[in-house]
Amino acid sequence: MKNEKWVVAIKMLPHKIYLKTLKGCLGMLLTAFLISHFSFLISSCARMGSPDGGWYDDDPPRVIGCSPEDKATNVTSKKITIYFDEFIKLADATQNVIVSPPQLEMPEIKTQGKRIVVNLIDTLKPNTTYTVDFSDAISDNNEGNPLGNYTYTFSTGEQIDTFEGAGYVLSADKLEPIQGISVGLYDDLADSAFRTKPMLRISRTDERGHFVIKGVAPGEYRVYALQDADGDFKFSQRSEMIAFSHQTYSPSCAPDTRQDTIWRDTLHIDNIVRVPYIHFYPDDVVLLAFQELQTTRNLLKIERVQPDRFTMFFTYGDSLLPVIRGLNFDSDSAFIVESNIKKDTITYWLRDTTLINQDTLRMDLTYQMTDTLGRLVEQTDSAIEVLAKTPYEKRMKQLKKDMEEWQKEQEKLKKKDEPYDSIYPVKPLEPKYNVSSSMDPHRSILIEMPTPLASLDTAAIHLYTKIDTLWYRASYDFGRKDSTLRYYELRADWQPSREYSLEIDSAAFIDIYGLVSKEYKQGIKVKSLDDYSTLVMQMIGMSDTSVVVQLLDKSENVVQQVKAESDGSASFYYINPGVYYVRAFMDRNGNGIWDTGLYDEDVQPEDVYYYNRSIECKAKWDNTLQWNLTEFKRYLQKPGELVKQKNSKSRKKQMNRNIDRAKRLGLEYVKDIKIKK
């Protein structure tokens, strides 16, 4: 009704005013209609698309220009500017950006919005190709999409050197990829060059241990790896990790094709195409990196954490023990000396309680030390003071406090008419028995004494075995383990599926301070042969040297170790069911342990090989496997499950964000992106 009156009122107006008013009203209605429908469309689009702002940007930044131009010749400027199509960031330029030839003065590398500026400090060398390898350090500022393997090149001469050489650096002992180690070329083929000259051209390994040296001129080269501690690009410190090879390389190239995978996303392949490219050689150099044995001998420190002993720590062992001359005590027969296998850690146990209670021991100490010429010489340190960490007075206060608390506890028991003690108990000797109720037939029982023994009564050690329902004495051997001071071993002919009982009388062990061991008893059940698996590795490609073969668990711990037979076989028995791996090394000196290399003596580390897959061992199974040690190149041998240095998947994670988001919206994310592996 109101609307009808409104229309009638308009019609009653004069003709011109009527037309003008009607036109204005229609315009207002049309405007309102368009606004409401536009708002509806916007809200509908928002509901159908992305309430959180659309697809993630997974495009890497693009280089749109350089100054000087990329691959420019006759360059004299030491300032380089690289321009991008968006704001970028540079991850840890010091570690990730490599300038070759190597720069003794660190270049200044920084980002400025959409550009990177590189200022070279060293004087430019004439007629030299320079490369600035950014690897994966460049990414866009917002989403972190990496540009990937970008290298800028220029030359101070008339031409650009374009050859490349590539390969892998692995740890010599475990074939683990070494990330971030420098790899360089020398055109001086003398062994001394690595010691006296900086590398000619340089690269750095990625997380796979892979390297590519770019901008190489024609010629003959030797390749080295160096964990450069002091930044001089040569082997100048014995602690530096290195790798060397006598093989020489002459770079070359040839036309080739490769398969490229075109991915719709990280899960679906769109197409596989063959792409022509220039293949540079060599592309499979393998360098085995190691650290030399540190034979420099110095005294690191002397500690007296416990009052009854003090320990000397050396950087390297020596067969000659230090000589101690006591200044405030009689050092004759004052100690029982214990050293580790390497003889770089030596513990002196004090025999006399008077010395134990003495807070300060002053002495002259004479020992073997390496001088500035690398020779072992006799060194005497005078008036050394060895201080107890906890002073005698403080120890006595603590002992008094403990006794008072014990007395209070006994008084409480006495008042309750419960059994109590009137004599403060003497602490017993407490050996550590490494034995459990279930035992493997090939194992022995280890016993660790907390202190050196004064006496040992083997007649107080009894081993019984159960046959049918009766117990009988079983024979055993008992003695020190590997000539150590405090570790003992009980060995017996353990019969599978049989029960045993280890019984040790009290006072079987008495230490140098008069502490006495308590009675000990442990039942033992030896496992059945049906619980185990047997594995025989039949090796091909062995050298004439002794070969040690190791059975490894998933954590690469050595489960068993055997020496290979002359026919190339290595047998492992009593294997508990599980997944295992096998490693072998060429034991050139026959000492049963892997030995590192020495550069000046031209000694390579002992060769290591991995069986390239896991081995499942099941109960009651006997496995025999053929193993050609050299069938696969070293960088392909170690099973991926054992490799600690994993490949980064950040690029694929960037793409997965869009895939995950598309799934949530019920859509399909399709984008042609090449991911080169």
Question: Where are the predicted features?
Answer:
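N-terminal targeting or signal-anchor segments and their processing/structural boundaries
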Residues: 8-26, 36-677
